[in-house]
Amino acid sequence: MNEMSLAELWVAVAFLLFVGILIYVGAHRAIGSALDSRGQRIAAELEEARRLKEEAQKLVAEFKRKQREAEAEAESIVTAAKAEAERLASEAKAKLEDFVTRRTKMAEDKIAQAELQAVADVKAIAADAAAKAAEVLLGSAARGDVGDRLISNAIGEVKTKLN
């Protein structure tokens, strides 16, 4: 055997003795339990991370749902406000039209009343003028009691027909 292989032999024997001592002492159980506990700790951390991820996803979904609800509510509020504004505008327009119609009717009634009064006044003035003209004409043509009676009858008849 050469020197190199003798050295390798001693290294192999020393290694086997070292491993044998470790097995005899129970180091493999300590190393195994340390690896097992580390594996369990890593598994627990992974489970916690998964749980936190699910919780975060639930919160994100909840916030998105609430945002959609808030947007829908805001949209319905805007729609209701527009509808209310349109209703109020049409109501105000209807009231204004009613007011204008009533004012126009009142003005037309006043004008009609004034026209009727003016016609009545003109008829009365015309009747008086006709009666005076008839009195003057008949007064010069007919004299005495018969003339006075004819004039009175004619004046009364003209007044009743013109009024």
Curated annotation (Swiss-Prot):
It is a single-pass membrane protein. The chain crosses the membrane at residues 6-26. GO terms for cellular component: plasma membrane; proton-transporting ATP synthase complex. Keywords: ATP synthesis, Cell inner membrane, Cell membrane, CF(0), Hydrogen ion transport, Ion transport, Membrane, Transmembrane, Transmembrane helix, Transport. InterPro entries: ATP_synth_b/b'su_bac/chlpt (IPR002146), ATP_synthase_B_chain (IPR050059). Pfam families: ATP-synt_B (PF00430). It is found in: Cell inner membrane. CDD domains: ATP-synt_Fo_b (cd06503). It comes from the Bacteria. GO terms for molecular function: proton-transporting ATP synthase activity, rotational mechanism; proton-transporting ATPase activity, rotational mechanism. The keyword Mitochondrion does not apply. F(1)F(0) ATP synthase produces ATP from ADP in the presence of a proton or sodium gradient. F-type ATPases consist of two structural domains, F(1) containing the extramembraneous catalytic core and F(0) containing the membrane proton channel, linked together by a central stalk and a peripheral stalk. During catalysis, ATP synthesis in the catalytic domain of F(1) is coupled via a rotary mechanism of the central stalk subunits to proton translocation. Component of the F(0) channel, it forms part of the peripheral stalk, linking F(1) to F(0). Belongs to the ATPase B chain family. F-type ATPases have 2 components, F(1) - the catalytic core - and F(0) - the membrane proton channel. F(1) has five subunits: alpha(3), beta(3), gamma(1), delta(1), epsilon(1). F(0) has three main subunits: a(1), b(2) and c(10-14). The alpha and beta chains form an alternating ring which encloses part of the gamma chain. F(1) is attached to F(0) by a central stalk formed by the gamma and epsilon chains, while a peripheral stalk is formed by the delta and b chains. This is ATP synthase subunit b 1. It comes from Xanthobacter autotrophicus (strain ATCC BAA-1158 / Py2).
